[in-house]
Design a protein with these regions (language model features):
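The C-terminal output helix
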Residues: 125-139
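Active-site residues of response regulator receiver
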Residues: 60-61, 91
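Receiver (REC) domain active-site loop signature in two-component systems and cognate sites
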Residues: 64
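Two-component/phosphorelay signaling modules centered on CheY-like receiver
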Residues: 2, 16-34
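Active-site beta3 strand of CheY-like receiver
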Residues: 50-60
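C-terminal output helix
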Residues: 95-97, 111-125
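Acidic catalytic/metal-coordinating carboxylates
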Residues: 37-38, 68-74
Length: 142
């Protein structure tokens, strides 16, 4: 699959090692990313940035101190943000039922830790393609 141009992968995980490993993996596949150490930090960025015009997706840890990944997901659902910003949950084995429930409520997918690099990148590329298609549809309507 061809990389989507001008796309950004947002990484939200409280574990610095996970954030760094994901950022490195994405760089190695020529996928730009921005990392956040908490749901609150990501939410603050969303409040200050202009409306989304480029494809993006969100890699979101389920369990974090403070606002959990699920709480952030619920906020994004309430705002209608999932249409153009697909969410891929990163989860430990114990959180798989929770992640499956989130997929039923609109998350793009979930990947269980430890995950296969190739499988994760494939899902990210699919999520970015979906984001790009939906943004193009919105542009055509306006």
């Amino acid at each position: 699959m061809e990389p989507v141009s001008n796309a950004t992968v947002y990484i939200v995980d409280d574990d610095a090692g996970v954030r760094e490993a994901l950022a490195w993996l994405l760089r190695s596949r020529r996928l730009p990313s921005e990392s956040f150490d908490s749901a609150e930090a990501f939410e603050a960025m969303l409040q200050t940035r202009p409306p989304q015009r480029q494809p993006c997706c969100l890699l979101l840890d389920v369990r974090m101190p403070g606002m959990s990944g699920l709480a952030l997901f619920d906020l994004l659902v309430a705002r209608g943000s999932l249409h153009t910003m697909p969410v891929i949950f990163l989860t430990g084995h114990a959180d798989v039922p929770t992640a499956v429930d989130a997929v039923k409520r609109g998350a793009f997918d979930f990947c269980e830790k430890p995950f296969s690099d190739n499988a994760l990148v494939d899902r990210i590329e699919q999520a970015l393609a979906q984001s790009g298609e939906r943004l193009a549809e919105l542009r055509e309507r306006s």
